[in-house]
Amino acid sequence: MIFQRTVQKMVKTTGVGLHSGNKVTLSIMPAPVNSGIVLVRTDLSPAVAIPAKAEQVRETTMCTALVNDEGIRISTIEHLFAALAGLGIDNAVIEVDAPEIPIMDGSASPFVFLLQSAGIKEQAAPKKYLKIKRPVRVEDGDKWAELKPFKGFRVNFKIDFAHPEIARSQQHVVMDFSTSAFVKDISRARTFGFMRDIEYLRANNLALGGSMENAVVLDEYRVLNPDGLRYEDEFVKHKILDAFGDLYVAGHAILGEFTAYKTGHALNNQLVRALLAQQDAWELVSFEKEADVPVSFTVPGGAVFA
């Protein structure tokens, strides 16, 4: 039997909120089987819990935000959720003392390290995968995203930026998902932004915590970060990272092929909602033997059964 996973112990970190610029403390704790990922705002009294579900994503401007019926939000969840998806964490309680997850270095890598530090614990319940049975597609102008049947989880992603530095890089990546491939090839890709947009963003109280410490920054011609890029194709790989996180609000690891052109947070969430609404397009499956699982979630550092 392939089992569900949570973290072995509580771990905590601090960082800066990308949009607020304020200090944020984040804690990740073990959670029971079949509870999923639940985020908790501990800066409110009483604390407010928001389950990570597709219908709770109600804001997708510059990030993915969970918002409850009272308008209480937790923003910028996508990089943390990419790490949770990449390491196959099914159940966790995530506490944060601010309206947003800390941006850290702009990638998922610090969250991967945090989860690895906590340890990964297998739980006494079968892991459920969301298997795609037929294609589901959403479009917005020339942008589109699609999930279709595939034995495993494949990403086929293309961006199209006219900026000379991005245009010079590889803008199309096809990869078969595994935990090792995610950690090595995707998790370190940072968010990126343009100097020309910063004045507008800050006038709208966005990106107040943004800097070259947590983003790739470009002017009209080049990357301004002194150390350059982490990957030659870091731009498209960060968009893939975002998509991993955005898709994980489906509640389970997906078995299928995700194909996308110029998609972002809004379209990614539309795709998840469209998929879940069409119940003949998917089914939940579990596996008895590891050899039967078409996706490799090799546990970093070994797992503990509980």
Curated annotation (Swiss-Prot):
Catalytic machinery residues: 265 (proton donor)
EC number(s) from the headed UniProt entry: 3.5.1.108
Reaction(s) catalysed by this chain's protein: a UDP-3-O-[(3R)-3-hydroxyacyl]-N-acetyl-alpha-D-glucosamine + H2O = a UDP-3-O-[(3R)-3-hydroxyacyl]-alpha-D-glucosamine + acetate
Enzyme class, broadest EC rank: hydrolase
Pfam families registered for this protein in UniProt: LpxC
Domain of life: Bacteria
Chain sites annotated for binding Zn(2+): 79, 238, 242
Protein task: Catalyzes the hydrolysis of UDP-3-O-myristoyl-N-acetylglucosamine to form UDP-3-O-myristoylglucosamine and acetate, the committed step in lipid A biosynthesis.
Protein name: UDP-3-O-acyl-N-acetylglucosamine deacetylase
Organism: Shewanella baltica (strain OS155 / ATCC BAA-1091)
